[in-house]
Swiss-Prot record:
Purpose: Located on the platform of the 30S subunit, it bridges several disparate RNA helices of the 16S rRNA. Forms part of the Shine-Dalgarno cleft in the 70S ribosome.
InterPro entries, per database record: Ribosomal_uS11, Ribosomal_uS11_bac-type, Ribosomal_uS11_CS, Ribosomal_uS11_sf
GO biological process, one term: translation
Lineage: Bacteria, Pseudomonadati, Pseudomonadota, Betaproteobacteria, Burkholderiales
Protein name, UniProt field: Small ribosomal subunit protein uS11
UniProt-recorded Gene Ontology molecular function terms: rRNA binding; structural constituent of ribosome
Keyword set includes RNA-binding: yes
Length: 133
């Protein structure tokens, strides 16, 4: 029993409020999901949210609205930590790219830089077969 109480105390102690004014929002927009992580300048995560974690399942996870809800959730937690200015780094071709940035902007967080960091191969590995829809 002492072990369970100890881990609960450790979890409660981790939720320390940090006063960080500037941060980086990493938006990973894939075709299936959108993941938003807000970090400080050193890369330590302050908050994160996913479309699937907001209650969207299946094909609804990949919608712009799901990305917007996830970005609002992560942004609110980051604002509680003191975030006022963000750099946004977008990775991936998914449909939630723009709506996540708009949602962060609508929260009142000042967006300083929007940067696309999508990895582009210089003719590396052979890609998977073409999709037929």
């Amino acid at each position: 029993m002492a072990k369970a109480a100890n881990t609960a105390a450790q979890r409660a102690r981790k939720k320390v409020r940090k006063n960080v004014a500037d941060g980086i929002a990493h938006v990973h927009a894939s075709f299936n999901n959108t993941i938003i992580t807000i970090t400080d300048r050193q890369g330590n995560a302050l908050s994160w949210a996913t479309s699937g974690g907001q209650g969207f399942k299946g094909s609804r996870k990949s919608t712009p609205f799901a990305a917007q809800v996830a970005a609002e959730s992560a942004g609110r937690v980051a604002q509680d930590q003191g975030i006022k200015n963000l750099e946004v780094r977008i990775k991936g071709p998914g449909p939630g790219r723009e709506s996540a940035v708009r949602a962060l902007n609508n929260l009142g967080i000042k967006i300083q830089v929007i940067e696309d960091v999508t990895p582009v191969p210089h003719n590396g590995c052979r890609p998977p077969k073409r999709r037929r829809i």
